[in-house]
Amino acid sequence: MAKSAQGRKKEPTPMMRQYLEVKERYPEYVLLFRVGDFYETFLDDAVTVSAALNIVLTKRSNGSAGEIPLAGFPHHASEGYIAKLVTKGFKVAVCDQVEDPALAKGIVKREITDIVTPGITYSDKILDDRHNNYLCAVALFKRGREHLAGVAFVDVTTAEFRMTELPVAELKDFLQSLHPSEILISSRDKELRDSLAKSMNTLFTVLDEWMFSAEQASQVLENHFKTHSLKGFGIDGVEGGRIAAGAILQYLEEAKQGSLKYLVRIGLVESAETMTLDIQTRRNLEIISSMQDGSLNGSLLEVIDRTKNPMGARLLRRWLLHPLRKLEAVVQRHDAVEELLESDSMREESRQLLGGIIDLERALARIATSRAMPREVRLLGSSFALIPQLKAMLASCEAQRLRHLADRLDSLPELAETIERALDPEASGTLRDGGYIRAGYHEELDELRAISSGARDRLLEIQQAERSKTSISTLKVQYNKVFGYYIEVSRANSDKVPEYYEKKQTLVNAERYTIPALKEYEEKILTAEEKSQFLEHRLFQELCAAVAAEAASIQKTAAALAELDCLACFASCADEYRYCRPAMNEGTELSITGGRHPVLERILGADEPYVANDCRVGSDQQLLIITGPNMAGKSSYLRQAGLVVLLAQVGSFVPAESAEIGLVDRIFTRVGASDNLTSGESTFLVEMNEAASILNNATERSLLLLDEIGRGTSTFDGMSIAWSMCEFIHDRLRARTLFATHYHELAELESRFERIVNFNATVVETADTVIFLRKIVRGASDNSYGIEVAKMAGMPPEVIERAREILAGMERREVEVPTQREAPPRVVSQQISLFEEEESRLRKALSGIDINRLTPLDAMMELKRLQDIALGKSKA
């Protein structure tokens, strides 16, 4: 007996069963399912995609299982839609039809052909050609009692692949400087993900724990690099980094990324060679983004990035975040910049050539993974043709670094010549359109094309012959995709059709036929076209394989070109901005004459010339206490010193008349503060955390830039902390320090410590305002001019007047400062009233007066005494 409709099991359609099977394997991905000319999404994915892409959400029948949500888009527009999804943080799995639907028996076979995530993408619609796009992995482990993190990162678009190990406490800072688009973490380390996610707007992907095993990692790395040992890469002893690198390779292989053979090397992050810049320093110095809105505008990078090639732009960004610490390396860059600066013709010619070279790194990655179009390969070949000129110029240079770059350049003449012979520069440049292989490159392809191109003439011959045989002058030989080639005869002439005509289709006003000769030629034409397309594609794949086989040489050449671009960029900046070559040494002196802030001077322009300042800090004046009002230039002075040092150790010339710089191992900054609400930290706690990190990590070779330490708490607490920090820096760290403060009491330190010196930001007072000269000069300031600044800001007059009254009262109070280091300023735990002490004295004086016995003269005398008490002239 048949089951009722209600009791029958609800079954999805065969295609939906296929979809659900694939989706089960990729639950965390938006699954794009190819159906004819569309990519469709179903169920929850459809709802997600509809909202993310702002496309229509509709429904589709799912057999007895009812209707399901559906959203989709045309396959030819897929790149743009996928880019939008990935930019919004989604991971996308592309499931394509892998057999001809016309030949399929049952459901068309489908497979995952590509995976696109924020960390795995080659699309120009997603990538910024001036930024690296890093995929990172983190592996936590212990060595003895020490908790460490192994970190590996790769940019699949440039083949940069490196690793390191570091204490877990330094992990967040390292990752924030790297700014990866995606971070891989073991399922056992989900707490780490939750912790990092609070401060990083990055996609975290959790992988199975087995993918982070040491044994698995070694096997994966050795298989990939085709070696029995990793010692040759210098990473054999970096177990945590190897584990992370192994996880990355496994993730890429599972992500259907095609051949990864172009990832030909892996290296270590050489922490001893470069300076570490923590997040506070990167932010406060506005190295790659401004503090105002996080954009490039107003940053150091915006000012000095005059690179001509995306490879150079990406390297410049990395250089700025990792200044050099080795004197020889810094001097070599300065030598190269100086030679490029002195030779205008060589500098400009090299920059022009660099501008004509394609992004070799990203082109190679797309070619090696079968994602490139013929046009990109052709541009690669034409780029090789420019390299001999650059190589010849650099080989004749005196600077050792420039000659070294010449040695690393390889124009690959044989490959370039093959590309030139193979690809037609006049072709459309897409694989779909064909015609991109030059005529004369391959004999068989030429023959097949001849058959196809001669088809029209042959068809006209058949048409003319049949018109003669049948006496039907309107007879036509035509073609469509459904019926192929056919002969069309009008209904009026159908009685003249010979018996050997085989009917194919009947229309309202015509009949369509075929004949043996037409069938034979149709098969020949279609076979030739099919063979031609297949052969052309095969030849292109062979050409791409030849390019990929030279991956190591191309990457080495690309790295040399990027470095040349950066050095020429520095020379161009030095020429245009009047930068000088700094004298570098191993000492601990910092002496800048006529120093300028590289960003502010560009913003101000010619209408308001930037006020240059000298800065000398070292063995005899190690700690500069800088006082003065807001808006007078103290913070800019601090940042200016930091940026001059950073530029020098990156290899650039610097904005100054002259500069002598003893190498710095770290630059620390504490400028401004804000609440860290996500971590439950107040402004003052954030400030103290940053200050503690500086005191615990700085050395004698560090540069400390400290602004308004202690302002996040009460006056006396803050001043005590600032005072104590100055003592600690002077006595223990002995680091070069610029210390800007509103605590004028700190000026006392100069008389008590041999290497502490006072400076101040000068102002000129007029009758009703103050003028900030933005000049830093010797000596202490005795006024912060805060009320004048408030007045300039437009505070109501009554607020300004009341502030003056309160200030006058507060200035009559004396703050005791320690006479010895062991006796810090006395801390007042409570402040009942602004004039608590004055009120107490006045109360005592008033209570002791016997009004009934006062003569008029006595009353006048008592009034004078009370006035003196109020003005602080008497202690009562």
Curated annotation (Swiss-Prot):
Keywords: ATP-binding, DNA damage, DNA repair, DNA-binding, Nucleotide-binding. One of its GO terms (cellular component) is cytosol. It comes from Chlorobaculum parvum (strain DSM 263 / NCIMB 8327) (Chlorobium vibrioforme subsp. thiosulfatophilum). This is DNA mismatch repair protein MutS. This protein is involved in the repair of mismatches in DNA. It is possible that it carries out the mismatch recognition step. This protein has a weak ATPase activity. Signal peptide: none annotated. GO terms for molecular function: ATP binding; ATP-dependent DNA damage sensor activity; damaged DNA binding; mismatched DNA binding. One of its GO terms (biological process) is mismatch repair. InterPro entries: DNA_mismatch_repair_MutS, DNA_mismatch_repair_MutS-lik_N, DNA_mismatch_repair_MutS/MSH, DNA_mismatch_repair_MutS_C, DNA_mismatch_repair_MutS_clamp, DNA_mismatch_repair_MutS_core, DNA_mismatch_repair_MutS_N, DNA_mismatch_repair_MutS_sf. NCBIfam families: mutS1, PRK05399.1. SUPFAM superfamilies: DNA repair protein MutS, domain I, DNA repair protein MutS, domain II, DNA repair protein MutS, domain III, P-loop containing nucleoside triphosphate hydrolases. Pfam families: MutS_I, MutS_II, MutS_III, MutS_IV, MutS_V. The keyword Ligase does not apply. ATP binds at residues 628-635.
